[in-house]
Regions:
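Classical secretory targeting signals
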Residues: 1-26
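Low-complexity segments
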Residues: 26-133
């Protein structure tokens, strides 16, 4: 009898955990106010070989929009490129789409971030034999 109670309790715990994971999978940020225009700024010097520029973006917090400056970062693995995040319009709200690393630069809203990110693709460098130029 104890085994049956334990098995049922374990099954219930697994089901509740799965429900919690599933419910958090679709969390996103939406705002009814458009983000401000991108500021004009100078790109700092690249700190060394293999660094990729990740452009700044407008984030949204309790006090409204705030600017997150761009920075040079090392890719997490050779061959990966950064796709910037962007604010898109849909269903009457602005929705933020997170940036991500991948084997190619994906869609980032057609936003001209400059510094190689002109709205389509990336023209800021390339991978060759495991090194970024």
């Amino acid at each position: 009898m104890r085994r049956i109670i334990f098995a049922r309790s374990l099954l219930l715990a697994v089901m509740l955990l799965a429900l919690a994971v599933k419910s958090s999978a679709g969390v996103f940020l939406s705002v009814v106010i458009a983000p401000p225009a991108l500021p004009v700024y100078e790109q700092p010097f690249c700190p060394g070989d293999g660094y990729i520029w990740t452009p700044g973006y407008w984030a949204y917090g309790d006090d409204g929009y705030f600017w997150v400056p761009g920075t040079w970062v090392l890719a997490p693995a050779p061959g990966l490129l950064w796709t910037p995040g962007y604010w898109g319009w849909g269903d009457g709200v602005f929705i933020f789409h997170e940036g991500y690393w991948g084997p190619y630069v994906g869609f980032y809203g057609g936003i001209n971030y400059g510094f190689g990110y002109t709205g389509i693709g990336y023209r800021g460098g390339y991978w060759n034999n495991g090194a970024f130029f």
